[in-house]
Amino acid sequence: DNAMSMNKDKDFGTPPIDTEQMVNLEIDGFKVTAPAGTSIMRAAASIGIDIPKLCATDSIEPFGSCRLCVVQIEGGRGMPASCTTPVAEGLKVVTQNQKLAEVRRGVMELYISDHPLDCLTCSANGDCELQDMAGAVGLREVRYTPVQTHLNAEKDTSNPYFTFDPSKCIVCSRCVRACEETQGTFALTIDGRGFDSKVSPGQNEAFMNSECVSCGACVQACPTATLMEKSIIDHGQPEHAIITTCAYCGVGCSFRAEMKGEQVIRMVPHKDGKANHGHSCVKGRFAFGYATHK
């Protein structure tokens, strides 16, 4: 039975490590065995402990920029990021306590202070990791009254398949890394420093004028509605999904066809696809209009 609900594939935060060597450690009092080199985040996720994260996703290498996933290690100093800290024999890791909760809420508050609070009209409509993490860290108010924000940044709608709305960008760099690691096109960079950092296609160009090949890896990597499929903006979030195979060429990429009733709203490369491992080209990803063409 290929039909499935909208349950997304679990995101372990960092990619799996392929090694025979195993390491034993303790996370929140639970004993865990994980391959050497695995991140603390992934090891925790493997036993059902989901450490809050924004810049980490298991299709790309860890980056350690959002600072939401900090943990404490017994006998260790400070609060290392669990996405970039590998497991080690005998480690005792704490992922939840009062101090960590305060730090995470503080970090989250800063993100939200420069983010439009238009969740009611946002096309992400609940499919938003920023919203999820605000809930996960227990953020209930934002005390900052920002003097400077990016809320008036101009939208780029030049790409026929997706829009880029920098006002919603949290500069997690997931799109830049997906373009680099998954697709290998290097169309995106982070331009500027500090508060002026922004995602830039090419040399500050529109998406359509950059090197972008419209593969959609960046859209899939984006945790907010900054990069969003135009089909979702037009039709809203899908309600159910079916695993299917792309019919364009002989590679046989596996997809989740996300649907609303009988209508395909979005094609998402299936993470467990043996031929494509969660990636695809523009044809399978966006050119699905023929499927229901009359």
How should these model regions be labeled?
Residues N2-P35:
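Generic start-of-chain signal for non-secretory N-termini
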Residues A3-F12, R67-V71, G76-S214, V219-T245, ...:
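Fe-S ferredoxin-like electron-transfer domains
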Residues P16-V23, S65-C69, C249-C253:
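A short, compositionally biased
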Residues V23-E89, Q98-V103:
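N-terminal cofactor/phosphate-binding cores enriched in small/glycine residues
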Residues K31, A187, S254-R256:
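Short, surface-exposed charged micro-motifs
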Residues P35, Q98, E102, I170, ...:
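Conserved active-site and cofactor/substrate-binding residues in soluble primary-metabolism enzymes
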Residues I242-D272:
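Catalytic and ligand-binding motifs that coordinate phosphates/metal ions
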Residues K260-K294:
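Cofactor-/ligand-binding subdomain signature composed of acidic, glycine-rich
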